[in-house]
Amino acid sequence: MAYSEKVIDHYENPRNVGSLDKKDSNVGTGMVGAPACGDVMQLQIKVDDNGIIEDAKFKTYGCGSAIASSSLITEWVKGKSLEEAGAIKNSQIAEELELPPVKVHCSILAEDAIKAAIADYKAKQG
């Protein structure tokens, strides 16, 4: 199985690795995956007063495709509204990274993680 140059680039030079303060009311955290079997993805967003994502961070434990999917989605959501970010589909991530069929589940984790982070942020807002 050969990885695309984009997967290799995001794996070797991941963007936005780290974490934001979970206690901050403007930070939403999404944690998805199965710790017992491998891939786990934590994705966090920081939302400004206008509902625009101003920062995004991730920590992913998994294969190169999972890390690349996390890195890519954190780049994509910055500057987007919650609605725009929530509309990102795993198929867009898989297509951009040219993921092989056996790695498409990694892009699904990224889609699930951003949706979970948005839901967490909205829950904090009441």
Swiss-Prot record:
GO terms for molecular function: 2 iron, 2 sulfur cluster binding; ferrous iron binding. GO terms for biological process: intracellular iron ion homeostasis; iron-sulfur cluster assembly. Belongs to the NifU family. InterPro entries: ISCU, NIF_FeS_clus_asmbl_NifU_N. One of its GO terms (cellular component) is cytoplasm. A scaffold on which IscS assembles Fe-S clusters. Subsequently gives the nascent cluster to other proteins. It is likely that Fe-S cluster coordination is flexible as the role of this complex is to build and then hand off Fe-S clusters. Zn(2+) binds at residues 37, 63, 105-106. It comes from Haemophilus influenzae (strain ATCC 51907 / DSM 11121 / KW20 / Rd). Gene3D superfamilies: 3.90.1010.10. It holds the Pfam family NifU_N. Its cofactor is Zn(2+). This is Iron-sulfur cluster assembly scaffold protein IscU. The keyword Transcription regulation does not apply. The keyword 4Fe-4S does not apply. Forms a heterotetramer with IscS; each subunit of the IscS dimer contacts an IscU monomer. Upon overexpression can be isolated a monomer, dimers and other oligomers.
